[in-house]
């Protein structure tokens, strides 16, 4: 079992557009919790007890949410990446707090706790492992936007970030198990053609030094990169948990069709129909007679009286 995890959360989520204008990607809500907390829930279920979060230079929202450790079991340490110069520099910010074997995950990458447990077990099964990678079946185009791997039996013989010509049927996704030895390779990692220092280069350098790198395969993950992903991930958690969670007072004439999550501090007008597969965040308001299904309504958003919305992220203007 691995007890420590580093979470990379410094990215602003540019491809999410207006959704990240007033908060970082790590704080986007998934059925009542930030995606950061959802990720921590899965890691904690696999045995993680301490988290080191690498936040952006001016990002205080993570500290505000986790500052008292009341929202998640285990200790939360927050450090800041001053410049967005890649995963290597982000991990270097966390390095002083790493005490032994650890997991590394991006904040936008959700996998099952069973896979996390399997990844940790495969890493720990070989004492000479410097790393174990999470692999996901992928198309060549998907691999071009991720990392390609060369598999040799039960180990990784090579890794390349964003390859022009992928050789594998698997992409390495941003969930790794590492020994502290991997940290020794970080300072020498060069800047890539993309202008960043990338963790795949450190892994490749360790392989070239003769270090052992293992892997575990998963066929499932949720990845938040676009607004359609935020909708899909919310619907996954709503359907997984089922029924409904209503934390605001609603008029008697409101119809709720589960699964639905309504946070505290939501205003819902009379004669509205909410659901199925709908999440209303604190600070949102639904006009009288509105009908919502398969929607996420974010804080500050207003749905006009009588409006009908389906399959949408509804954000403030």
Q: What do these predicted regions represent?
A:
Residues 1-7, 15, 28-29, 33-107, ...:
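Conserved N-terminal catalytic core of the sugar/cofactor nucleotidyltransferase
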Residues 11, 108, 226:
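Active-site glycine-centered loops adjacent to acidic/histidine catalytic or metal-binding residues
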Residues 21-25:
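Short alpha-helical oligomerization interface
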Residues 27, 148-151, 215:
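A structural signal for short hydrophobic beta-strand segments in well-ordered beta-sheet cores
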Residues 52-56, 134-135, 296:
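Short internal beta-strands
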Residues 103, 120, 124, 155-242:
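Catalytic-core segments of class I nucleotidyltransferases/pyrophosphorylases
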Residues 114-143:
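Conserved donor-nucleotide/metal-binding helix-loop-beta segment in metal-dependent transferases, i.e.
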Residues 248-317:
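Structural signal for interior beta-strand "rungs" in well-ordered beta-sheet cores
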């Amino acid at each position: 079992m691995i007890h420590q995890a580093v979470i990379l959360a410094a990215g602003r989520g540019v491809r999410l557009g207006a959704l990240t204008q007033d908060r970082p990607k790590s704080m986007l809500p998934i059925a009542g919790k930030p995606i950061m907390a959802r990720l921590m829930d899965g890691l904690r279920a696999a045995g993680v007890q301490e988290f080191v979060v690498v936040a952006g230079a001016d990002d205080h929202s993570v500290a505000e949410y986790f500052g008292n450790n009341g929202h998640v079991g285990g200790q939360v340490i927050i450090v800041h990446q001053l410049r967005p110069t890649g995963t290597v520099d982000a991990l270097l910010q966390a390095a002083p707090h790493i005490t032994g074997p650890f997991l590394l995950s991006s904040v936008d990458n959700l996998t099952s706790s069973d896979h996390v447990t399997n990844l940790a077990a495969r890493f720990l099964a070989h004492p000479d492992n410097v790393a174990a990678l999470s692999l996901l079946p992928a198309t060549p185009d998907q691999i071009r936007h991720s990392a390609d791997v060369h598999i040799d039996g039960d180990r990784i013989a090579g890794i390349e970030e964003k390859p022009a010509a992928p050789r594998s049927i698997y992409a390495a996704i941003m969930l790794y198990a590492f020994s502290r030895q991997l940290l020794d390779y970080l300072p020498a990692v060069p800047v890539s053609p993309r202008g960043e220092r990338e963790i795949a280069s450190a892994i490749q350098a360790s392989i070239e030094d003769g270090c052992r790198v293992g892997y575990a395969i998963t066929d499932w993950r949720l990845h938040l990169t676009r607004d359609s992903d935020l909708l899909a991930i919310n619907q996954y958690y709503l359907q997984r948990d089922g029924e409904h969670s209503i934390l605001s007072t609603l008029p008697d004439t409101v119809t709720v069709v589960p699964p639905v999550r309504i946070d505290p501090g939501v205003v819902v007008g009379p004669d509205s129909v909410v659901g199925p597969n709908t999440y209303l965040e604190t600070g949102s308001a639904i006009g009288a007679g509105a009908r919502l299904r398969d929607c996420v309504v974010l804080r500050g958003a207003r749905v006009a009286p009588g409006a009908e919305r389906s399959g949408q992220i509804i954000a403030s203007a």
